From Swiss-Prot:
The lineage of its organism: Bacteria, Pseudomonadati, Pseudomonadota, Betaproteobacteria, Burkholderiales. InterPro entries: 3-IsopropMal_deHydase_lsu, Acnase/IPM_dHydase_lsu_aba_1/3, Acoase/IPM_deHydtase_lsu_aba, Aconitase_4Fe-4S_BS, Aconitase_4Fe-4S_dom, IPM_dehydratase_rel_enz, IPMI_cat. This is 3-isopropylmalate dehydratase large subunit. [4Fe-4S] cluster binds at residues 347, 410, 413. It comes from Burkholderia lata (strain ATCC 17760 / DSM 23089 / LMG 22485 / NCIMB 9086 / R18194 / 383). Pathway: Amino-acid biosynthesis; L-leucine biosynthesis; L-leucine from 3-methyl-2-oxobutanoate: step 2/4. GO terms for biological process: L-leucine biosynthetic process.
Length: 469
């Protein structure tokens, strides 16, 4: 019987299934960070349990670490406690960790693939919503809660119920100026933030196949914003080429065996999906969110929608509340919206490809950050991304134009460190969530691609990067 990619990943990890469908799954890799792991480790200590499979875990501090000068450590006592606690727990249990001043440190969903700890055919979990990122490698990856983090540490298994299968098929050539971020925002705009609820989404079609691994990770990263449990892309040569030679990847004869095994992780011809959604890539334009949910998105050449035209009273109320919070009027052209701050970073868009795309726009415009922009910051996703960008001179492109070039971390995506918006400030952000207060109490977030964020920094408002040439 023909199987989907999700079916194969699920079936190869079943330990036991109850009559009601509840399944005990084996977990190949757990990624840990400082926010959702302390209680899990404490639970192990209280129960006097060891970590079942130490080598299956990899840890890094990312949420609370400062992105400015780290020579004096972490100033905030709560943030310092969380980071110090992860350090102590990893030392106590023997878990591999990239500490704050390790060049390999970075955002957990960037360092996993970067190190080759994310591999095709794996089940991967982390106490973090955007674990779906790793599905770009033909893996089953999703976020879990703190009690589940403890369960995986203790047993290397997890109780789950199987999701339904959804295929999101994007065909055609992506227009100039459009990126993976625009693809996934367009998908969420089409199906809504509840469109994927109860499903695992496979992203397929010629447009997805043409993406780099960085682009595929961006798309899978935001599967959770479409309501899905997981997002994934089939394994192909692009996947294999990206992984070869990375530190955690098999070598020699084991590499050849692994590649042969990995190539099975794609949907069979004739595999049945519970739902299929199709998009024409040629119709996608640069996207900008206008509200307080990723589904509240429109094209750069569009306008802020008018709630009065919405027939659904629930949606209309949500739109009215969002516009009030965002301080926007219906029918406002998106290009006329001015911004106060720029954030280029996050597990969605802080890889080297993203940094290059933003730097290209800055260099093309050949001007400094607009006078109305109070802060424009670039936060690489890892120390290795930062080092690569600096070797290419990209840091100087940004700093010469008035951007701040920072140390790696989650940063302004969720404002758990000192990087945040003040009340009323408007930000063009390459992150994944534009909820109320996400980037700081009263802050107003517009989600865009790195190129769009860079252009907004220079112009002081949103612009159509397709016009840049």
């Amino acid at each position: 019987m023909a199987q989907t990619l999700y079916d194969k990943l699920w079936n190869t990890h079943v330990v036991h299934t109850e009559e009601d469908g509840t399944t005990l799954l084996y977990i190949d890799r757990q990624l840990l960070h400082e926010v959702t792991s302390p209680q899990a480790f404490e639970g192990l200590k209280i129960a006097q349990r060891p970590v079942w499979r130490i080598s299956a875990n990899l840890a890094v501090s990312d949420h609370n670490v400062p992105t400015t000068d780290r020579s004096h450590g972490i100033a905030d006592p709560v943030s310092k406690l969380q980071v110090d606690t992860l350090d102590a727990n990893c030392d106590a249990f023997g878990i591999t960790q990239f500490k704050m001043n390790d060049v390999r440190q970075g955002i957990v969903h960037i360092i996993g693939p970067e190190q080759g700890a994310t591999l095709p055919g794996m089940t991967i979990v982390c106490g973090d919503s955007h674990t779906s990122t790793h599905g770009a490698f033909g893996a089953l990856a999703h976020g879990i809660g703190t009690s589940e983090v403890e369960h995986v540490l203790a047993t290397q298994t997890l109780l789950q119920k199987k999701s339904k299968n959804m295929l999101v098929k994007v065909e055609g050539t992506l227009p100039r100026g459009c990126t993976a971020k625009d693809i996934v925002l367009a998908i969420i705009g089409k199906i809504g933030t509840a469109g994927g609820t109860g499903y695992a989404i496979e992203f397929g079609g010629s447009t997805i196949r043409a993406l780099t691994m960085e682009g595929r990770m961006t798309v899978c990263n935001m599967a959770i914003e479409a309501g899905a449990r997981a997002g994934m892309v089939a394994v192909d040569d692009t996947t294999i080429d990206y992984l070869k030679g990375r530190p955690f990847v098999p070598t020699g004869a084991e590499w050849n065996q692994a590649v042969e095994y990995w190539r099975q992780f794609k949907s069979d011809d004739g595999a049945q999906f519970d739902r299929v959604v199709e998009l024409n890539a040629a119709e996608i334009v640069p996207q900008v969110t206008w509200g307080t949910s990723p589904e509240m998105v429109t094209s750069i050449d569009g306008r802020v929608p008018d709630p009065e035209r919405e027939k659904d009273p629930v949606k209309r109320d949500a739109m009215e509340r969002a516009l009030a919070y965002m301080a926007l009027e219906p029918n406002t052209p998106i290009e006329s919206i001015k911004v106060d701050k720029i954030f280029i970073g996050s597990c969605t868009n802080a890889r080297i490809e993203d940094i290059r795309a933003a730097a290209y726009v800055v260099k093309k415009l050949n001007r400094r950050v607009a006078s109305n922009v109070r802060l424009a910051m670039v936060v690489p996703g890892s120390g290795l991304v930062k080092a690569q960008a600096e070797r290419e001179g990209l840091d100087k492109v940004f700093t010469d134009a008035g951007f701040e070039w920072r140390e790696p971390g989650c940063s302004m995506c969720l404002a758990m460190n000192a990087d945040r918006l003040d009340p009323g400030e408007r930000c063009a952000s390459t992150s994944n969530r534009n909820f109320e207060g996400r980037q700081g109490a009263g802050g107003r977030t517009h989600l865009v691609s790195p190129a769009m964020a860079a252009a907004a920094a220079i112009e002081g408002h949103f612009v159509d990067i397709r016009q840049l040439g």
